[in-house]
Amino acid sequence: MDTVTIGAKGISVSLDLAVGHIAGMEVEADGRVLKPLHRAPWVGSPRESLPENLPEGTVRLSGDFLCAPFSASDVEAAPLHGWSANSAWDVVENGAIAGGWRAVFRLRRKVMGATIDKVFTLRDGHPFLYQEHVFSGGSGAISVAHHPMTVMQGGGRLAFSPKRVAVTPATPLEPDPARGRFMLAYPARASDLTRFPLAAGGATDLTDYRAEDRREDFITLVEADHGGPGWTAIARRAEQDLVLVLKNPAELPITMLWFSNGGRDYAPWSGRHIGVLGIEDGRTAIGHAASLGDNWLKHEGVATAFALAEGRSVSFRHVIGAAPLAGGEPPSSVESAPDRLRVVTAGGAARELSFDGGFLRIGRSVPA
């Protein structure tokens, strides 16, 4: 596998250049090595052991990757989640910067005529990967999402920045009981994340990832207006750590959750993709055409694509991090300061992590 690994004090990240997926991320803290991101169990298996028609991005499914577009490429022909998640990236820059390391990768293919750069920055002593994607030129509009995945051996608890509403699509990912299973009601919506409708009746707590619930479920969370960074925190029980995913809601106004816990019985999933949660921050509906057309998010006042044009560029930023955590309870709030991230528990105890508070550009204008 053609991977590039970059590092700074206390952190390293590897990128699989064949598909632009993060192949590994390690954070050193309190004498431990934390691994916040997931890799599918079939990665590295002989290609002939996997279904012939599998997109390359599923063959090498790992870590986080750029979806451009998210889901179906039904405007410009490409595999699921676009060429950005299924084809080769080149190293454009890779070197030390003051107090850290920076690498720039470029997608060989163009998307809607645009050149795409992926920028990784690591800082000494910061337990975070700082990412930026830059689209230069092109025409039309593109929907986008990050696709970070974490995995829990014994389940975990989730917490979020304020959300306006949670909505499931019209149909589940796996409607055929011969192929898989799901738990949530489709379509459904709720403003209380701790009481979301179940297909079987009643309600479930979306903030409780239970290891025993075998299912594939997909739900979209719409950010509320709160003026701070958007964040998702996952307190992983068995791993005794906290995984943090942060965004600028003006750039990426929704967070899509993919609960993948042994809910697909067909290859290559085969009931072995267990304990996985995708935290997919995006500016998208489900599919490129849906994102450009009329969709329910637009009716909620939520943008679902970035406009592209020759002579201009658009970009968005994203952060993934990890820290040790005993007790398994996620934070009640996450607050950004210029040089640190303050993680506050329900009991009021605070922990501070070294953080570039200006990176996410909160409060600054974003192109349409």
Give the location of each predicted region:
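Asparagine-centered strand-capping/turn motif at beta-strand->loop junctions
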Residues: V134-G138
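Surface-exposed acidic/polar loop and edge beta-strand patches at domain peripheries
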Residues: M1-Y130, A141-A368
